[in-house]
Amino acid sequence: MRAGDKAVAASTRLIPESSLVKSNLRLRLAVPSLLAAVSFASGAFACSDDVTPALQQAAGAAPAPAAKAPAAPSAQAVTIDPGIPDYQAVQGVSGSVKSIGSDTMTNEMSLWIEGFKRFYPSVEIATEGAGSGTAPPALIDGTAQFGPMSRLMKSDEIDKFKAKYGYEPTGVPTSIDMLAVYVHKDNPIKSLSLQQVDAIFSKSRKGGIDHDIRTWGDLGLTGEWANKPISLYGRNAESGTYGYFKDHALFKGDYKDEVKEMPGSSAVVNGVAGDKYAIGYSGIGYRTADVRAVPLAVDAKSPAVEAVAEKAYSGDYPLGRYLYIYVNKKPGAELDPLRREFVRYVLSKPGQEAVVKEGYLPLPATVARKALESVDLAPKAGT
């Protein structure tokens, strides 16, 4: 692991680096009983911004046929891990704070704030979702006390924070997202490999395909689709989604100049919904009836995987990721009551119910406990 990646991994403050299972962009969540009593493989939090070994091999591989079509998705309902505690209000919570960061998490933050204020009506929490890239500077200069991010902080962002405060920011995982590749609901494409996604969106084509994919016919579609140019929708550089997709779907290559950079996650989905020949990427929580999430394969020899809950928990869906709230917490010092209780609320049963309501996946109890421990909020005995 490179020095910069060590800093990124350390910034989560969940477990020591030596406990990481291995560099893997997948969530690596084990499911003893589907979507119930979920725990991490090896009992450890494993998350890295490095590409998987499978993707690294694929980057040097020759182009292969389209990914195998997936089986029909399961209709398994998403439930809250019974080990997640309910929330109990405490005395002494007041004041006002601001949240600046991820657009992907804007709706989640709004629901969390709404639920939190039912317990503490006098509290004021303002939220601004301009992109994950706005969170680190806001935390550094103190204009925000919460920094929602749809990616881990980069090592240079951590370095700037540490240069001012002498310690690293703390990233608290709050929920699980599946970054989806969307097409219009009438598009007949069955599946895509990440190498095909790369050749569609990237001018670098580091995935291994040696030619641009510019029309739907290049992907094997016939009839009216054969000669239709693919219209590209994405996010801007301030977005954590932009960076995550660049790293994990484009093999750290550069976007094509013709990608339409939309101001938010919903704008991407709306753009695709209104453009029959479009393709775009956004969080699964923004899916609507007018678009379809295309099943994705790690490479052309692997089966394509639907963007469904059990495939994220099992680690099979290739673009699963954690969504974080970063806070400025000095080691050994307690968070103030407002920030402390908001974090506790997010990781409680009602907080995780809000996650499900927004179309994201709730944390396993094991992960929620580690997240609480990362900010010195170990669960009380009996919880």
Locations of regions flagged by a protein language model:
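Flexible loop/hinge segments at secondary-structure junctions
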Residues: 48-383
